[in-house]
Amino acid sequence: MSINYPDFIVVDDSRLDCFISQKIISTTCQNATVQSFINAADALDEILNRQNGSAKDLTIIILDIQMPVMNGFDFADAFENLSEIIKSGYVIYMVTSSTNESDLIRARNYPSIRFLYNKPLTKSIILEIINTSYTN
């Protein structure tokens, strides 16, 4: 019997970090669909095009903070303005290579952001994300 893992969207301007995240997610959650975006605006467009989420009940967004054009907090601001119907199909986990405490404090102010993790992603972080994504 296989576990039905959620889908993932990885948003990171680093192609290498996107690749690493995809590999870790794919090996940890073998039947999960993983989409990567190096531009946060493109990821937001994808969410808007989906309207009611993916075919699965939940999509987990792994969101980098420091990106050009639209950073993680800009993305979160735009996401917070979406309809509740759209937002209900997603949970956001931010990732960063920064040790800036103000990022953690700021992330806590967004209802859609569940937690802020330090890079790099690991299998244990992905499993923790999955376990906490289905609880409020």
Whereabouts are the PLM-identified features?
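C-terminal output helix
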Residues: 120-130
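Helix N-cap/capping motif at the beta->alpha junctions
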Residues: 36-49, 72
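Alpha4 helix (beta4-alpha4-beta5 surface) of REC/receiver domains from two-component response regulators
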Residues: 74, 87-90, 98-115
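Two-component signal transduction core modules
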Residues: 61, 115-116
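Receiver (REC) domain active-site loop signature in two-component systems and cognate sites
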Residues: 67
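Conserved acidic segment of CheY-like receiver
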Residues: 6-16, 21-25
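Active-site beta3 strand of CheY-like receiver
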Residues: 8, 51-62
